Amino acid sequence: KNVLSDSCTFFSPYYRQISMDSWLSLDTALIEKRFQLAYKDVVAAFRYYWNNYNQGRPFILAGHSQGAKAVIELLKHEITPEIYQHLVASYAIGYTITQEELDSYPYLRMAKDSTDVGVIIGFNSVTKPEAISPLFKNNIVCINPLNWKTDASPGVSYQGFTASIDPSI
């Protein structure tokens, strides 16, 4: 059971993933080359979903880590104006989006609060700034999932956990 299953019809593609060794190499050319194989599977699955199952309904894209990269690439290269009008939001958790990407792709829009639609909800969780992967050094998209703010004000979960954003990193 997933977070969205009570309110959504859930579709999740099977796709080939690149190994952790590839990601840990920090070799962006190697990562990109290997990711393209996985991404072809994601594109085929999204197109099949759109053409056979969506039927004009609102939809959410969601992915974590490599899946978040796939979501970002779908937004860059597969989303058309017709498709975009049905997009509620894209959860791209655990990956990076640069300012250059935001400036270059019209469907990469950063969430600024809880009422935004057609936006990317993204963040990377770490216990301390030193733990941030070099792959995420230029990330610009971040919203606190506990309070839906993009500033440093802390959000508190119903379980008492506190999370805050450091806008300087």
Question: Model-derived features: where do they sit?
Answer:
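Active-site catalytic motif of lipid deacylating hydrolases and related acyltransferases
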Residues: 1-57
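Active-site-proximal beta-strand/loop segments in catalytic clefts of secreted hydrolases
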Residues: 14-18, 63-65, 92-96, 126
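Short, solvent-exposed loop/turn and secondary-structure capping segments
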Residues: 22-24, 73, 102
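A generic short-segment signal for beta-strand/edge and adjacent turn/coil regions
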Residues: 28-29, 58-62, 89-92
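Surface cap/lid and interfacial helix-loop subdomains adjacent to catalytic sites
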Residues: 41-56, 76-169
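Gly/Ala-rich beta-loop-alpha elbow adjacent to hydrolase catalytic centers
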Residues: 61-71
